[in-house]
Amino acid sequence: MQPDSYPKILFGLTLLLVITAVISLGIGRYSLSVPQIGQILWAKATALEIDPVQQQVIFQVRLPRILTALCVGAGLALSGVVLQGIFRNPLVNPHIIGVTSGSAFGGTLAIFFGFSLYGLFTSTILFGFGTLALVFLFSFKFNQRSLLMLILIGMILSGLFSALVSLLQYISDTEEKLPSIVFWLMGSFATSNWEKLLFFFVPFLLCSSILLSLSWRLNLLSLDEKEAKALGVKMAPLRWLVIFLSGSLVACQVAISGSIGWVGLIIPHLSRMLVGANHQSLLPCTMLVGATYMLLVDNVARSLSDAEIPISILTALIGAPLFGVLVYKLKRGGMNE
């Protein structure tokens, strides 16, 4: 990437995101044209009278859903790219540390016992952070410097919680509880509102701000530990901080929209093709690409058929072939990340 091309790429991605978001306001059963959307937004900004139906559709249904999709997409993509950086492995994604499965079990447990919305949030977050604590505990117990051990612990916990989720599904009431559990696990923004958006936006803003401020340090994680230490950077604390922040993003995401896969794996690869591997430019680019991608997927989910398609189905259908194409191009170009 040429040094002067990064601002242009960033501006182009930002413009694409804004255009996609505006068009998304008009997509749905109650369709609106771009001029109509502009008139409604202008009327809202200038306190003019707005059609009650249009106001309800735009500001109470679609706008919080769009903003939630943007934040979730940016958060998952950011989590994926920083984890790939600290593990020095392009195949790592947020699921690898077990937080997704732990949070999913917490949410499934809440639905199984009929908890309220706040109970669902609390259970999901507690099990997500509990899983993260177990990863830290076992990693320190065995070998805190071994990245392989950390991955193995995450995989073990992920498998355990996935089995527990399956057990709860097996014993759930097939008339009421099971459909709710299955739909929630597949991921959706159908129930998005301002309350859920605020619940996710606060930790998203905090975690993403810290990770962006650490972007130059993330470049040092590609160095040997002795070389990084010579430069005055302590690898272990930085690595644990990044894992904690990434896990926090994932746990909060699962709480509001269920389990969504492939985003944290695919988007970092697409972003590297645009701006390279320097985390100072890669992180903002990845967040913009992730936000736009998630918004496009959600548009397809709510407009392709009368019944809304779960997000995780679409991300897998798009992500798996796309990842195959990326791997083929990397191999053909002789690249080896």
Curated annotation (Swiss-Prot):
InterPro entries from the entry? ABC_BtuC-like, ABC_transptr_permease_BtuC
Q: Which domain of life is it from?
A: Bacteria
Tell me which Gene Ontology terms the entry assigns under biological process. siderophore-dependent iron import into cell
Task: Kindly indicate whether the keyword Transcription belongs to this entry.
Answer: no
Question: Which ranges make up the Cytoplasmic topological domains here?
Answer: 1-5, 88-98, 141-146, 215-234, 276-278, 330-337
Q: How does it sit in the membrane?
A: Multi-pass membrane protein
Q: Give the chief site where it resides.
A: membrane
User: Where does it reside?
Assistant: Cell inner membrane
Q: Name one GO molecular function term.
A: transmembrane transporter activity
Its induction note reads: Expression is repressed by molybdate.
Q: Does the keyword Transmembrane helix apply?
A: yes
Provide the assembly information: The complex is composed of two ATP-binding proteins (MolC), two transmembrane proteins (MolB) and a solute-binding protein (MolA).
Q: What is this protein called?
A: Molybdate import system permease protein MolB
Which species is the source of this protein? Haemophilus influenzae (strain ATCC 51907 / DSM 11121 / KW20 / Rd)
